[in-house]
Amino acid sequence: MRFLVIGRGWTGNKVHDALLNRGHTVEFISHHEVDGALRDLPSFDWVVNCAGVTGSPNVDACEFDKENTVIGNAVFPIILHEKLKNTRSKLAHFSSGCIYVGDIQGSYAEPNFFGSIYSISKGISDIYLKDRAMVFRIRMPFTGVNEKKNYLTKVYNYAKTAKLIDAGQNSLTDIDEAVSVACDLMEEDAPLGPYNLVNQGSINMHDLAQIMGIEPEWFTPEEFRVATAAGRSTCTIPDTGRMRPVKEALADAVAKMKLT
């Protein structure tokens, strides 16, 4: 199969490498290079959008760059889909589960969290693409490699320099597992629609701190609201059944990080 992977960030690199390792032909571009690459659209089986604005070092940064956040997370995926109309290429889009708050049930639910421009922008494209693309939702992605986009790396760093907040149970994503499942779904030509690529079960921050072997200080909810510019999504969403239990995946990732 022939793939066009858009977005040279953390997720895009993982998707690119995974597809190459499976023997596929892969063209890898940044979102700035899309117009030129799309001239060759008829030859791609899948266009995989991994581009997006997440904010650095965290989602608070999006509040101070609303225009680019909306363009990257809402406008760009919709325009990309429109460019694919009347071609043989199908669109796969990496989205976010941080469009929800609470315990979400059922195969599909409308976004219900609007506490940050990041979540709002992701929710817009999620709604538009739900029947038009394969939508891969991930949450708080982690891996066993110590790198800045790794959720576990962020937690380690926050525990050293600030405090943590435990707002309740969350679904999380082992990003390497998620990428593997995403590749499986595209190879299988699975139905278009949303796929929650989260590990089975959920975890709260106190339990995560115990797995990680850290003893952080904790924000009160009031302190956290004062310290942050954006609200945070706290939610559990149904999993696909294709990924490991979250506590098993986290323990494995933490063990690998301590070895490197």
Describe each PLM feature range:
Residues 181-228, 254-258:
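Mid/C-terminal beta-alpha module of Rossmann-like enzyme folds, strongest
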Residues 244-260:
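Amphipathic terminal alpha-helices
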Residues 64-71, 75, 98-136, 140-143:
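Catalytic helix-loop patch of NAD(P)-dependent Rossmann-fold dehydrogenases
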Residues 115, 127-170, 177:
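NAD(P)-dependent short-chain dehydrogenase/reductase
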Residues 61-92:
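NAD(P)-cofactor binding segment of oxidoreductase domains
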Residues 34-72:
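NAD(P)H-binding glycine-rich loop region in Rossmannoid oxidoreductase-like domains
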Residues 1-22:
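N-terminal Rossmann NAD(P)H-binding glycine-rich loop of SDR-like oxidoreductase domains
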Residues 10, 203-205, 220-248:
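Active-site loop of classical SDR/Rossmann-like NAD(P)-dependent oxidoreductases
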